[in-house]
């Protein structure tokens, strides 16, 4: 049965800001929340599992999904394709479950256009220095790739004000608390319209 109270939450962030960790922690706290698993053409990392972290597909398979209109949103990030399956999201919402998407700002813009009632949340690092530290501590990318990720991250962060809420991920537990409050409808202190939030974010941006 369709439940009009079911909401769609969109979480976006620059690479290294910690959105994956935050969303996974939130889903543990709120098992009724449905996490939409994205399609990607990216190569699977050693710590990732098919159907758990991503749905890994070929470039041709992704092109077919996109051409058929099976994707609610799609974006090209670091030479790889990412997208959210439309049917999966629609079914969860129809079943009355809140759904959370973990995507980038490009995809978030598409979802806001397709689903104007969605709640959008942008995750920021506490500083650009901390962002660089997090990217380097992964030990998965070359210096050239890290420099590119940092450059793209700064560009991504310029879109923060397009979102309904902003969370500074300087303390994991507090950031998860903020994310949970937003899902519960009590996240006013994180609203991007709030002057204190805007001042804090502007101090982070270069």
What is each stretch, according to the model?
Residues 19:
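Conserved lysine of the Walker
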Residues 38-99, 105-109:
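ATP-dependent small-molecule kinase phosphotransfer cores
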Residues 2, 140-141, 158-206:
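NTP-dependent small-molecule kinase module
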Residues 27-36:
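Post-Walker A helix-loop "phosphate-sensing" segment adjacent to the P-loop in P-loop NTPases
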Residues 99-104, 113-138, 168-169:
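Conserved phosphate-donor/acceptor-positioning beta-strand/loop module used by diverse small-molecule
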Residues 22-23:
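Post-Walker A alpha-helix
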Residues 12-14:
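P-loop (Walker A) phosphate-binding loop of NTP-binding proteins
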Residues 1-8, 31:
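Extreme N-terminal, non-catalytic leader segments
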């Amino acid at each position: 049965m369709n439940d009009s109270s079911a909401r769609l939450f969109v979480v976006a962030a620059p690479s290294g800001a910690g959105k994956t960790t935050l969303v996974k922690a939130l889903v543990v706290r709120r098992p009724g929340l449905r996490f939409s698993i994205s399609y990607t053409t990216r190569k699977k990392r050693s710590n990732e599992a098919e159907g758990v972290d991503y749905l890994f597909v070929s470039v041709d398979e992704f092109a077919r999904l996109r051409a058929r209109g099976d994707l609610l949103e799609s974006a090209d990030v670091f030479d790889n394709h990412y997208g959210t399956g439309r049917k999966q999201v629609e079914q969860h919402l129809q079943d009355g479950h809140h759904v959370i998407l973990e995507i980038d700002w490009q995809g978030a813009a598409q979802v806001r256009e397709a689903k104007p009632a969605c709640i959008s949340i942008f995750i920021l690092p506490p500083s650009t220095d901390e962002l660089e530290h997090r990217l380097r501590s992964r030990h998965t990318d070359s210096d050239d790739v890290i420099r590119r990720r940092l450059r793209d991250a700064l560009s991504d962060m310029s879109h923060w004000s397009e979102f309904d809420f902003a969370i500074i991920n300087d303390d994991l537990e507090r950031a998860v608390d903020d994310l949970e409050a937003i899902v519960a409808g009590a996240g006013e202190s994180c609203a991007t319209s709030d002057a204190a939030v805007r001042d804090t974010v502007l101090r982070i941006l270069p």
